[in-house]
Every structure is written in C-alpha cells, then in structure tokens.
C-alpha cells in the first residue's frame, strides 16, 4: 500500500534548512551509479581472491562507505567509520572458533556439541553487539548513532521469534516480525535522541495474508500440474525401469521445474511480506517522539526489482551485481522519508550541541564486528 507519493529531489533540497511543511516528508535519495560502484566492486573481488579472503574486511568498509556516503537526506550523506582491522579481528575470532569446533567434533564429539551449545547461548549477545557496532560506526552530520539493546531482547527477537514462527508454519511470523522491529527501533539512538516504533500486529497480519495467499495459490498451481502428470510419477515410483528414456528425461525436467517453482513461490511471498512489514514498522516509527518516519515501498515493484536483480546477476555471472545493488538502494531510499516537526536547521543544531553518547574510545577498545 502506497502511503505517500515520492517527492522530487528539488523539493527535498528546498526543505534542507527551513521549516518542513505540515505533512511534508523529506525523502532520502541515492546518488551513486552502477558504473561508479563497479570500479569499487571489481577491485574488492580481485583483492579478496588474491589475499585468500583477508581483504574482504576492507572490502566491506569500502562498500559500506560508498553506499552510506551516497545515501543522502537533506543534501547530506551518511558516513561509515569502521576500519578493516576491526572487522578482520572479529572474523578471525569466529574463524578460530569454527576450527576448534570442527576439531573437537571430529575427535571429541561430546566436547564439540558442548561448544556448539555454548555458542548458541552467546548468539543473542553477539547479535546485540553487532547491532551496536553497526550503529556506532554510522554518523549523519557528524553525530553518531547508537544502539542500547540488551542480549535478553535479542534472544526474544532473534531466537524465540523465529522458532515460534517456524513451529507454527509461519502463522505467528507477524508476531516475530513485530518483536524484531520493536527491539531494533526502540533501542536505536541518534545522538541523545531515541527512536521508537510500535507496529500494529493487525496491520502486519494484513501483509502476511497477502504472502500466505501467494503461497497457497502457487502450491495449488504446482499441485495441479503434478496431478496432470500423476501417471508419470506413479510409474516412476513403481519402477523407474518401466519409463522410457524420453519419459525419464521429462520426469527429471518436471522435478527441476518443481524445485524452481517451489523456491520462486516462497521467495516471492517472503519479499512481498518483507516490503509490507517494513512499510508498517517504519511508518509507525518516530524520532525524538515527534519526527515521523515513512516507508511506502510498492510490494509488487520491490519484489520485481529483487527477483530481476538475482536473474540478471546469475545470467551475467555476477558482473551486473553492482548495477543490481545500486538499483535496489535507489528504490528503497526514494521510498523512505522523514517528516520533521520544526525548523530542520535548529533541530540538528540542538542534537549536535548535545553531543553523542559514543566516544572515540569505542573505536579503539570495544569496536569489533563479529558479523552478526
């Protein structure tokens, strides 16, 4: 459901430092290009291969700095302050754990299982720390973001929620989505100011109903074609030798197509659900209790962009991946906005004057990214 029409870049620029009109959402934009990002991407790929993956940490920094810097709100881009060494150290710790785990699992299976259980206990803490790291290395107008969520909230949002959703075959997925967005949104800070969101479970279920309908309809179509070829499947079950070579080939093609359709159905449903839930959660969010956020992604358009991006990337053996990433970033940014209550210049001046809860010592002492 489209909640508001996109604003032109000119309109956004005019509102950069004045009072935002009532109901006027300032849209984000993405100023990068596929051609420009391709140069960064290809160097990242080549250096990652040459260094046997070590450079991937610095590749992540270069990629994020490009996308953050080209994500523009009110004429100013975001900044990404992480360093490659921080990301590399975190990855080396995780890599060392995996080596120890596999060694123990091979020679002392019980110890390996115990180490796995210990790791699972630490997952909520790692998730909370990862979100904290990502927030704290991000800034806008020289003011850092922060994340204050605890491991207990991460356990509910990222462990309990997915388990409940899986056990109920997705019926309680909206509840899990609500927990996740509330955990992230209610613990995010910009300077000393807090974000908050409380998405309606009923509205999320409306998005879920659309995805559920896609799955049911898709499975009915697959089931119908399977019924038409019931004789072939029945013969194959009774004895594969009874099938001719042509029928065996046809059966193989049908099975492959069935798998493709299965993943396509659930993939499309997941994308439709993701866009819908994002719209609900972002549009229910506020900043500093009075500035409203907005997301009005078109479910159909978002799904088409995501699927076509994957297809184009596969067909071109990955060479069009930069174009696909820029295409998605541009679309999502253009359908994300903020409505400021008051004079924008005064709002950001006050936030900058208050300062940030994140000190420079975080980058030197605590700042490691474990990839969660």
Regions found by a protein language model. Give the residues of each.
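Alpha-helical transmembrane spans of integral membrane proteins, capturing the lipid-embedded, hydrophobic core
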Residues: 37, 41, 45, 49, ...
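Alpha-helical membrane-embedding segments
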Residues: 96-111, 147-160, 171-179, 215-233, ...
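Membrane-helix interface segments in multi-pass membrane proteins
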Residues: 2-6, 60, 101-119, 218-270, ...
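Selective recognition of hydrophobic, aromatic-rich stretches within alpha-helical transmembrane segments
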Residues: 49-63, 107-137, 166-187, 248-281, ...
């Amino acid at each position: 459901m489209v909640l508001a029409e996109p604003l032109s870049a000119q309109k956004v620029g005019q509102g950069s430092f004045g009072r935002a009109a009532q109901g006027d959402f300032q849209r984000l934009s993405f100023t990068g290009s596929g051609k420009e990002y391709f140069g960064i991407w290809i160097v990242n790929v080549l250096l990652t291969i040459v260094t046997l993956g070590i450079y991937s940490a610095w590749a992540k920094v270069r990629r994020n700095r490009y996308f953050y810097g080209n994500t523009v709100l009110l004429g100013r881009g975001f900044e990404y302050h992480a360093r490659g060494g921080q990301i590399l150290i975190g990855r080396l710790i995780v890599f060392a754990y995996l080596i120890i785990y596999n060694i123990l699992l091979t020679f002392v299976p019980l110890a390996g299982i115990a180490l796995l259980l210990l790791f699972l206990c630490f997952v909520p803490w790692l998730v909370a720390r990862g979100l904290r790291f990502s927030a704290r290395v991000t800034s806008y107008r020289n003011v850092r973001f922060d994340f204050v969520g605890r491991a207990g909230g991460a356990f509910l949002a990222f462990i309990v929620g997915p388990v409940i959703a899986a056990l109920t075959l997705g019926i309680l997925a909206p509840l899990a989505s609500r927990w996740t967005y509330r955990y992230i949104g209610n613990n995010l800070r910009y300077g000393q100011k807090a974000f908050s969101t409380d998405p309606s479970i009923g509205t999320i279920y409306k998005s879920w109903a659309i995805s559920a309908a896609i799955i049911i309809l898709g499975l009915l179509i697959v089931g119908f074609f399977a019924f038409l070829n019931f004789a072939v499947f029945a013969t194959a079950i009774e004895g594969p030798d009874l099938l001719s070579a042509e029928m065996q080939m046809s059966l193989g093609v049908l099975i492959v197509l069935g798998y493709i359709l299965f993943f396509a159905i659930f993939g499309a449903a997941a994308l439709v659900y993701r866009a819908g839930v994002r719209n609900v959660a972002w549009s229910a969010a506020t900043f500093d209790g009075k500035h409203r956020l907005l997301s009005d992604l078109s479910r159909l358009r978002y799904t088409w962009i995501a699927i076509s991006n994957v297809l184009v990337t596969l067909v071109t053996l990955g060479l069009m991946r930069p174009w696909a990433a820029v295409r998605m970033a541009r679309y999502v940014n253009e359908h994300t906005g903020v409505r400021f209550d008051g004079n924008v210049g005064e709002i950001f001046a006050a936030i900058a004057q208050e300062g940030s809860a994140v000190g420079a010592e975080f980058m030197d002492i605590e700042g490691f990214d474990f990839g969660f």
